[in-house]
Amino acid sequence: MSLRHIIVLVDPNHSQQATPAINRASQLAATSGAAVQLLSIAYRSELDSSHLFDLTDLEKLRESFCSKKVAELNELASPAIKQGIHVSSACLWGRDWVDVLLTHLGSTPCDLLIKATHKTGAIKRFLFGGSDWQLIRRCPVPLWLVREGDWHAGKLVAAVDPLHSQEGYAGLDRKLMHWAARLHELLNMEEHYLHAFMPLPRTLVFDAELVADYDGYARRCQLQHREAFEKLVSQRPVPLPQTHLLQGYTEDVLPAFIEQQSIDLLLIGAVSRGQLDTALLGHTAERVLDQVDCELLILKPDGFGQDSSKP
């Protein structure tokens, strides 16, 4: 897994809130040697069109506005630069920041995108707006969502699904494991791997043979998942206590596990929906992302979003 180029997305209206994201990029760059770009995407409606200025004057005003934002980014970059990290700054202009960003990612090397998020106060949840969900679904590169407050590079968990029916998910599981291993190397994080499964509930079993031996069916289901999970995690020299096969619905099991184990980072995959370039997160995954109290690293299958600039 290559980590040479990191982009940190900075809200031009709240640039100081990007400090945790910049810190995370600095941690990774310090050990990987990656170059970091601080990127803002600015827009002011009054500079988009005006009867008072011609197009040339408007363009100059936008350039001036973006130059001020770049100066702010340079100031934010100063601590990292003093650490010897290569940091550049850029400001792009556009009404829809997600589309502008995805176009930029299509022409700029990027191995990891980092974005700060906000939480809804005492209930400790991420606060995702509509544009955030667009980015989560459409971003073609690994996306690290950073939370406010102190963060310790202690434990990570990769949520894998070795029996997923979606084509290409096996490669995504391997990608999750590669990233987990790399973060262990770079940040000395303790790796954990988790697979949650749930047999078909008894109330939904209509086959007479299965109804008669539901307990046997449940045991066979557990064995099938255990064998597939053990085969997958055998690719990594991880102690058995750091592998977790849990029975239950993922949206219930995963947030509870993260809280009980004091997990600092969740690695989770998002699969593509047929030929579309958006990610099929689904109700389950969206509930997980909305409930977990840790930072998130969301990965897509290789080849995802070849034309991700389109909705």
Where are these regions (language model features)?
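Small/aliphatic-rich secondary-structure junction motif
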Residues: 1-57, 155-211, 291, 301, ...
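Structural beta-alpha unit
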Residues: 1-2, 16, 75-113, 233-266, ...
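General small-molecule cofactor/ligand-binding pocket signal
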Residues: 37-39, 88-92, 144, 192-194, ...
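A short acidic, glycine-rich active-site loop
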Residues: 57-71, 213-227
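Active-site-adjacent scaffolding segments
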Residues: 108, 112-126, 139-144
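Glycine-rich, Arg-bearing micro-motifs that act as flexible, cationic patches
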Residues: 115-134, 265-291
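Short, acidic/small-residue loops that bind anionic groups at enzyme active sites
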Residues: 134-148, 291-299
